[in-house]
Amino acid sequence: MNFKKKRWHCLPGQPITELDKQVMYWENKGKLVPTRDMIKTPEQIAGIRIAGKVNTGCLDAVAAIIRPGISTQDIDDVCMQYCKDNNAVPACLNYEGFPKSVCTSINEVVCHGIPKKEDILREGDIVNVDMTLSVNNYFGDASRMFIVGGKTTPEKEQLVRVAKECLEIGAEAAKPYCFVGDIGHAIQKHAEKYHYGVVRDLCGHGVGLAMHEEPEVLHYGHQGTGMLLVPGMVFTIEPMINM
């Protein structure tokens, strides 16, 4: 694939760095490379880490209440209160009309489930809680999967385990000067080993200064394809698999 317009530009008046050399090398070979504004500064990364830490705390607060009998609205209430207590803004609230602060997806719902008083968690349900928030205009995005009551069917237990393994394997593939396709390839290979399908309509994405940024991180694909990964890029890996 050849891109007529160059995406990478060296800083005027500055020496060419190893990063410049690597990116220009791959761009000259016809690979898709990031633009310079996709590379976060150390200060920006520090702010994103703070947002990520607050987001982790929010999911920890959710973990403390997950049990049979609560509603997904109860989860939303906890997330809203946690954001208020920690000077954070729930990014999902009113995003493209989404009415709640968090996504709660039960069993066959892949993602973006809307919390409701009527949606009561039952023993053996699997529920994904997907939270994005901002702190001082920096964004953190993460989700966590729960088995309600701690026990479910062997089929659901394996699905949850393999999904987590896909995340870990995808993260291991995210190395400097590799490609987004390397991540997707690793995830797809592991999921298909257990005869699961990878959801293709949704993907990970860049994050940090906004809720959704470049690049799109597909959870399937081929090695050596997609955008070049370089130090300073920040993105989510959120594999979704199904039986």
Predicted features along the sequence, with ranges:
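Active-site neighborhoods and metal-handling regions in enzymes and metal-associated proteins
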Residues: M1-M243
